[in-house]
Amino acid sequence: MNTLFMHCRPGFEGEVCSEIADLAARLDVSGYAKARPDTACAEFICTEADGAERLMNGQRFDTLIFPRQWARGLFLDLPETDRISVILAQLSTFPTCGSLWLEVVDTNDGKELSNFCKKFEAPLRKALTQAGKLVDDPRKPRLLLTFKSGREVFLGLAEADNSAMWPMGIPRLKFPREAPSRSTLKLEEAWHHFIPRDQWDERLSGDMTGVDLGAAPGGWTYQLVRRGMLVTAIDNGPMAESLMDTGLVQHLMADGFTYKPRHPVDWMVCDIVEKPARNAALLETWLGEGLCREAVVNLKLPMKQRYAEVRRLLDRIEEGFQARGVRVSIGCKQLYHDREEVTCHLRRLDVAKAARK
């Protein structure tokens, strides 16, 4: 099991390779990354048998930026018939697993395999259970089978608490009909990724205040309003009437890069299409000056050297807060609903909850 297999957004295979090679260098795991363009996956081949396991044990999955899912294991060729027997034979060296996910890569070819996986899962699950290879126990490793075709599968293992929370890392979020734009799903997914669900009532409560920079027509404002927050929407464009009718939104025609609230707020969110360095500077200003407690900001990516640019910006942000003596937690992820961008979440660790004005 010396291969680490990772899912990603199509077109970002190179970024996954760069990021995982960085990780391997830090953890002193020898090997090499490889991927083909637009295949929505990448691999890191370790030269030592325990290399993939050391990579996974040495890194929290939710702190990786570009991989959507990961698993350590091996590729297996399958016959046209009796695939289950071949899989069971190969799994003889695997530990007993506590859950089973069948996955495909996020390409058109991968999506065509979804129906096959749905039909194949029940008999496979039954066979694994009868063979003693699958029990219902979240403390045990998760068995991840990624089908590249009906004749090739990656047999992988991952800890349930150190891998994606959804199969393939793709959330099952429903677009709310009353939301003014589909961008609303980006912020909802960000909350799922960066904030533990049992902390939502505390950190996304109805007595909070928020600012949405570049808000129009209100996709991200909608998420704040849905949690009951009072929101100041900053944009020279029009906001959706449905949001203004809630009485929870104040719309100010102003520049999102120069606006500052008179009183600190709990949340600042921003999805302005601008150079990433400029949006990153907003994070430094708002968190560093105590204008907000938490923030979600999207950084649009350049065409080339995307991982290097993200890493450079994150390092600069971190150094800026260290220079100010401000304690923050910093998270960054290319979410499923992101396109040529990544989403950053920052939280001040030394500021009390803002008073609602």
Swiss-Prot record:
Top-level taxonomy: Bacteria, Pseudomonadati, Pseudomonadota, Gammaproteobacteria, Pseudomonadales
Function: Catalyzes the 2'-O-methylation at nucleotide C2498 in 23S rRNA.
Highest taxon above the source species: Bacteria
Principal cellular location given in the protein's record: cytoplasm
Catalytic activity, EC: 2.1.1.186
Pfam families: FtsJ, RlmM_FDX, RLMM_N
GO molecular function annotations of the record: S-adenosylmethionine-dependent methyltransferase activity
Enzyme class per UniProt: transferase
Annotated S-adenosyl-L-methionine binding sites: S183, A216, P217, G218, G219, D235, D255, D271
Active site positions, chain numbering: K300 (proton acceptor)
Family that this chain belongs to: Belongs to the class I-like SAM-binding methyltransferase superfamily. RNA methyltransferase RlmE family. RlmM subfamily.
Catalytic activity: cytidine(2498) in 23S rRNA + S-adenosyl-L-methionine = 2'-O-methylcytidine(2498) in 23S rRNA + S-adenosyl-L-homocysteine + H(+)
UniProt xrefs under PANTHER family: RIBOSOMAL RNA LARGE SUBUNIT METHYLTRANSFERASE M, RIBOSOMAL RNA METHYLTRANSFERASE FTSJ DOMAIN-CONTAINING PROTEIN
Localisation: Cytoplasm
InterPro entries: RlmM_FDX (IPR040739), RlmM_THUMP-like (IPR048646), RNA_MeTrfase_FtsJ_dom (IPR002877), rRNA_MeTrfase_M (IPR011224), SAM-dependent_MTases_sf (IPR029063)
Name of the protein: Ribosomal RNA large subunit methyltransferase M
GO BP annotations listed: methylation; rRNA processing
Cysteine-cysteine disulfides: none
Gene name tied to this protein: rlmM
